[in-house]
A protein has these predicted regions:
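Short, acidic, metal-binding catalytic loop of nucleotide-sugar glycosyltransferases
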Residues: 25-34
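Non-catalytic, C-terminal membrane-associated alpha-helical segments of glycosyltransferases
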Residues: 247-297
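A conserved acidic beta->alpha catalytic loop
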Residues: 26, 41-50, 97-98
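A short, conserved alpha-helix in the catalytic core of glycosyltransferases
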Residues: 164, 170-175, 180-206
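A recurrent flexible, glycine/aromatic-enriched loop bordering the glycosyltransferase active site
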Residues: 147-166
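Conserved donor NDP-sugar-binding/catalytic core segment of glycosyltransferases
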Residues: 102-135
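Short beta-strand-to-loop acidic/aromatic patch adjacent to the donor-nucleotide binding site
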Residues: 87-96
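Conserved donor nucleotide-binding strand/loop of the catalytic core
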Residues: 53-73, 77, 81-84
Length: 297
């Protein structure tokens, strides 16, 4: 049986110090006491490193990086660092994740009830207004979100890193997130990698608020112009994720990217050729992209 003292929360942060402060306060307020917290600072330039160096928080471990590894690289780095600390389980989250006080307690109860016979456990993610966060709805299949949050546990095949709990034995078996993804789809690829072989569950009693700065569906046709360039990672990484599903995965990719192209053409904000180029250049890059699965040393 695992208790909070066996768990390391891995928090990846980048230039969001006000949100990080709230995340750490929420972790300190957990009813399951004794949690270690490992913060990976992705070379922030907003005073995060200085803040962490002066923070007197029990169980806090900081890793200050000299370059931004992205969310994918940050979680891969943090999970390896957590393994070196000797923990039995990791609890992954972004710096804008605000766990409710009983979030970890509910995950630990589910772990005990299942006696560790699972791949990962995922929390219910809420928007600040209390509604379900659409960006973080788990998938019951590769193509459909779960139907709701009724019951003690819900089968799922993919989930985000907003609040993901897994044992270190699972990490040793299935490896680490693919750092080369940098951002986007690293969490879905990782959770799908595990769910192919082990049952995975959503635990509705474990609740977190995802205080996203840019809420909504990931789509270059809807997002703000300042974020368009980074979508090359999204369209590239999705190819790696879905091609493993065979013909159905390729059809899904082509249909999704074609639909996003149509939406861009309908968008009145302009720069349509640029955005369509990002979609299909990302797709082409994904066809050639063959990253290796990293494992703990």
């Amino acid at each position: 049986m695992i208790d909070a003292r066996d768990v390391t929360a891995v928090v990846v942060t980048y230039n969001r110090l006000p949100l990080l402060r709230r995340c750490l306060a929420a972790l300190q307020a957990q009813t399951a006491q004794g949690l270690r917290v490992l913060v990976v600072d992705n070379a922030s330039a907003d005073g995060t490193a200085e803040y962490l160096k002066t923070l007197a928080m029990p169980g806090l471990v900081c890793r200050i990086l000299t370059e931004n590894l992205g969310g994918a690289g940050g979680f891969a780095y943090g999970m390896q660092a957590a393994a070196e600390l000797g923990c039995k389980a990791v609890w992954l989250m972004d710096d804008d994740t605000l766990p409710e006080p009983q979030a970890l307690e509910a995950l630990l109860a589910a772990d005990a009830a299942m006696d560790g016979a699972y791949g990962w456990l995922s929390s219910r993610a809420l928007a600040p207004d209390g509604s379900d966060q659409p960006m973080n709805l788990q998938r019951k299949t590769m193509y459909r979100d779960i139907d709701g949050f009724d019951g003690k546990e819900i089968p799922a095949v993919m989930a985000s890193f907003v609040s993901l709990f897994l044992r270190m034995d699972t990490v040793r078996q299935f490896g680490l997130p693919i750092a080369e993804f940098f951002i986007w789809s690293d969490d879905w690829e990782y959770t799908r990698r595990i769910s192919r072989c082990k049952p995975c569950r959503v635990i509705p009693a474990s609740r977190v608020v995802h205080a996203m700065q840019n809420p909504g569906i990931v789509n270059i046709a809807r997002d703000v112009p300042e974020r368009w360039a980074r979508y090359r990672y999204f369209y590239r990484n999705d190819v790696v994720l879905y091609r493993r599903e065979g013909g159905a995965g390729w059809l899904w990719l082509l249909a999704k990217d074609a639909w996003h192209t149509v939406q861009v053409l309908r968008d009145s904000r302009g720069r349509r050729a640029e955005r369509i180029g990002i979609i299909w250049k990302g797709f082409a890059a994904g066809v050639k992209f063959r990253p290796q699965t990293p494992y703990l040393p």
